């Protein structure tokens, strides 16, 4: 196992700062997740913690829960509702996305908004050159990756119910403005190079 595998793959006990009311979650799942039946065990995934991610397991099923982190958040950051909406829409168009079981935007359940999706087994390849695989296996993975990307770009976002998702046009301008504001909101000290970059980017955006 590589150092990256050991650090970022698998699960660990839930960190104290990220624990929540398990009984409240079980009540919500009983009401909103078809086929759910406890008892439930909860572990925290080692990686992917911009939005804390948990593995939920019962005697008959496994799920993944992603939630907003607790505490004060920057505006528009950690929008788990957007993740849920896009993956649900793509899955309904036949794209290989995990099944979405439900979204909860009621902070009173476990403290922050969250959604629950199916747990899907998979492999993580840290090196894009795939040096440990046979040439024919590498070729198959690259071909599958290209086919999946082509499938994604072939989906009609209007037909998928995402016609009102985001704002059309001026993506770079809006992104630069949003991230500049968020940087300033989180700034703890003045960094001249960053201020210069914030001034430079709008003038040179594609």
Map each language-model feature to its residues.
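Juxta-kinase regulatory segment immediately upstream of eukaryotic protein kinase catalytic domains
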Residues: 2-36
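ATP-binding pocket architecture of kinase catalytic cores
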Residues: 39-200, 204-206
